[in-house]
């Protein structure tokens, strides 16, 4: 109901805010920040200690913060997918990763039902809110070794850093026993730092350049 709507509103705000921050600070850094925001917000939700107005506001506020973290997650993740995954695999990878949102919602629902039936209701719903933060802690350790997006680095003039990131990725591929074919120089594209674009450019892109896609995307979320 209203709590889910607040969470969704937080996702929208988080996607806009952290998406822009991701363009400035990098995908890898935002992977850690947004996950930390979600962990903080969702973890605090479990510590709502009453039903009076103050605690209800606290619960809504923490769910909004958790939603911001998830919205920022998808902004950073989808940017990284677009920049690092080859075009012929990009759609499948995108569906697979974004599909985990709905898979996680289903798993979380059944887990919450389990907790509510096994433990007292006052404890069961809190445990449901703590599932996500516990998984987030594990994911933080996994993400520590992720390289920065070489394309993002090139767009920000970090040529040496981009080459180092590519070397790291290629080393991991070779470690798994795969051979990399030489790159055809004729397929190379020139990349250089671009101008900084704000929210006004985004609005024009959505409602002037691609209005049908904007309506379709909004309809799917509703």
Task: Pin down the residues of each PLM region.
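Transmembrane-helix signature of 12-pass secondary carriers
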Residues: 1-222
């Amino acid at each position: 109901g209203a709590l889910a709507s607040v969470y969704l509103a937080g996702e929208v705000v988080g996607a806009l805010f952290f998406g822009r921050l991701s363009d400035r600070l990098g995908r890898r850094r935002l992977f850690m920040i947004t996950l930390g925001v979600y962990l903080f917000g969702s973890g605090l939700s479990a510590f709502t200690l009453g039903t009076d107005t103050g605690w209800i506001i606290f619960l809504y506020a923490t769910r909004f913060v958790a939603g911001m973290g998830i919205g920022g997650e998808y902004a950073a993740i989808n940017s990284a997918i677009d920049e690092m995954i080859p075009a012929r695999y990009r759609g499948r990878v995108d569906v697979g990763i974004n599909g985990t949102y709905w898979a996680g919602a289903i798993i979380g629902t059944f887990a919450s039902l389990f907790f509510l039936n096994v433990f007292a209701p006052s404890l069961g719903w809190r445990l449901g809110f703590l599932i996500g933060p516990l998984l987030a802690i594990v994911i933080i350790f996994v993400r520590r070794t992720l390289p920065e997006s070489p394309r993002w680095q090139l767009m920000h003039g970090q040529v040496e850093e981009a080459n180092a990131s590519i070397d790291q990725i290629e080393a991991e591929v070779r470690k798994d026993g795969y051979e990399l074919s030489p790159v055809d120089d004729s397929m190379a594209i020139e990349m250089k730092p671009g101008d900084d674009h704000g929210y006004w450019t985004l609005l024009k892109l959505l409602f002037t350049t691609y209005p049908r896609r904007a309506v379709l995307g909004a309809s799917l979320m509703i």
